[in-house]
Regions:
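N-terminal active-site segment of His-dependent metallophosphoesterases
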Residues: 1-78
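Active-site-proximal beta-strand elements of phosphoester/diester hydrolases
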Residues: 14-27, 140-150, 191, 255-262
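Acidic/histidine-rich helix-loop elements
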Residues: 21-36, 58-68, 94, 153-161, ...
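His/acidic metal-ligating clusters that form di-metal
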Residues: 47-50, 142-144, 156-247, 315-316
Length: 317
């Protein structure tokens, strides 16, 4: 990775990430006070090693100062002294600042690990960060950040998809890290904004945990990104936002597909579905991770309600 700020597992072998998603701040800020208070409280209670913003940090359409707005969101992590990484959502660059310029807002920020990514592939903000071992200079895990775009061409409609050149880039990065790890895939996570179509599949075909109060708003085109993740064998879990009142997760072909918990108050939500954040904890040397929710009222949700596909029942074994 090109960044000189190296992430590392703690001496106890853990690494904790807080995922904030769909903050939807704007530069007037009036409706974001409870959002920022929530974020500050989560960081104070969880003391993570990294904050990841999985898109729609701002509602940029009509905002005269979108760069200021997006900086105000990530400043919450800066004030807490915690490094952060960003992927853009479909609402972050709908106004006067284009996507390429918006991701570069974080260049030179001492707390930002965000990268614009290769100029010769689709999207802005495709990059990978490695976590060094607690007592080693070798990578112990990897975090992939992928730009899922915004909107599909009008003749297709709906949302954008992760492009083939981005998938090829991921495969190249994964291959290199696997070779560096003695031929064994490096335990990894992937973060992007718009869920891939397999989020619908896992809900309909497997036992999931958590809520689905709206349809999965994935692209109409399945470009094969999830297939590549399965084939490479390194990514253990994916984390998205986009659908504000979904927070479920389920495992499909060995990969846990996870929604975050929508964080922002300046956007749609649901009565009785508090804003919050998803917490992710890696353990050095293990191909596994723990995850839980921390909600606005301080509740920590370790076990989410199970959902079974139609016609299935829980085993009593």
């Amino acid at each position: 990775m090109s960044n000189d700020k190296q992430l590392r597992f703690r001496p106890d072998g853990t690494f904790k990430i807080v995922q904030f998603t769909d903050v939807h701040h704007n530069s007037d800020g009036n409706n974001s006070i409870p959002t920022f208070e929530l974020m500050e409280e989560v960081l104070a209670k969880e003391t993570p090693d990294l904050v990841v913003f999985t898109g729609d940090l701002i509602s940029s359409h009509g905002d005269p100062r979108p760069k200021d707005a997006i900086r105000e969101v990530t400043a919450v992590a800066e004030r807490a002294g915690i490094p952060f990484a960003v992927v853009l959502g479909n609402h972050d660059a709908e106004g006067i600042v284009p996507r390429e310029e918006m991701i570069s807002v974080f260049d030179g920020n001492p707390y930002s690990l965000t990268e614009s990514g290769p100029a010769d592939i689709s999207g802005f903000g495709n990059y990978v960060l490695t976590l060094q071992g607690s007592g080693s200079e070798q990578p112990g895990a990897a975090l992939y950040f992928v730009d899922s775009g915004d909107y599909a061409p009008s003749h297709i409609g709906g949302y954008d998809w992760i492009k083939r050149d981005q998938i090829e880039w991921y495969v190249q990065q994964s291959t290199a890290l696997t070779e560096q790890n003695g031929g064994k895939p490096l335990p990894s996570l992937a973060f992007f904004h718009i869920p891939v179509p397999e989020y619908e599949e896992v809900w309909n075909s497997h036992t999931c945990s958590g809520a689905r109060y709206e349809d999965v708003c994935s692209p109409k085109i399945n470009s094969g990104f999830f297939t590549a993740l399965v084939e490479m064998g390194d990514v253990m879990g994916t984390f998205v936002g986009h659908d504000h009142v979904n927070d479920y997760y389920g495992e499909l072909h060995g990969i846990r597909l996870c929604y975050g918990r929508a964080t922002g108050y300046n956007t749609y939500g649901r009565e009785g579905f508090p804003r919050g954040a998803r917490i992710i904890q890696l353990q050095e040397g293990q191909r596994a991770f723990d995850s839980w929710l921390r909600l606005a009222d301080g509740t920590v949700v370790k076990e989410q309600t199970q959902h079974l596909p139609a016609g299935r029942v829980l085993s009593e074994a």
